[in-house]
Amino acid sequence: YNPLEETNGNQVAWFLLNQTPPRNPLFWATEFHELGHAQLMQGFWGEGEAIVNFPFSYVLNEKFGVDNDTAFQKTVSHANYTVDDAAIHWMITENFRNGNPMDNSNTTLDEFRYQQRGYAKYADIARLFGWQALKNFFYQENVDFNAGTLTCFEEAVCRDGLVQADSRIFRLSKAAGADLTPLIHFWGVHPDNSTALAQAITAAGLDNSTIIRDKLVYYAGIAPTNNAQFNTHFETVFPGRPAYGHPDYGVGWYN
């Protein structure tokens, strides 16, 4: 690639061509990660290098008919987590056990960036409430942005009177038609003002969800409770349990 080369808009790239044989869409993770950045999606604090992977899951599932678990697995090329595996990956951390939010320090200890547990909450919303719930949410975000009335944009307090994280939980809940607070809390994003958020949820007529309750009970049942179960999970996401890597993340964290 030569940045000084004049292409007149005709730069040849593999993803612009009808390749023969066609490139397997399951291996487009990096391209869709960068395309995700280009969408300028807002997210919870710390999701910047996480949520951008998620639209690829929608494309694989809706466009190519890939089942939800496989579609989610293929959203990154360096790991092999289903949503259930991502839940386990989060539940076996000290932060989860101690009731803390997911680490978003942008250090090697960060538990969001480039990791499927960092955006699995959206996969759960899609699995429990359908893709339309997320389509409703992001469509409204786009409409509001274009109209210059985005609920939260570089403001500590949003137009709905809630702080940013709480407002996003509230808006996602409205799009899904149910109170998503417990689900999002499970995934390590805690309300800043739970009282104000609960009042907004109630005022909007959003109820507690039995399917969320059932999902959280299910997650409690798959959390490893001993070393053998931990190693079974390790083998699932990193076959062969390789003994290398940085101790703060990836395969090295498991060692």
What are these language model-derived features?
Residues 1-127:
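Catalytic cores of extracellular degradative/oxidative enzymes
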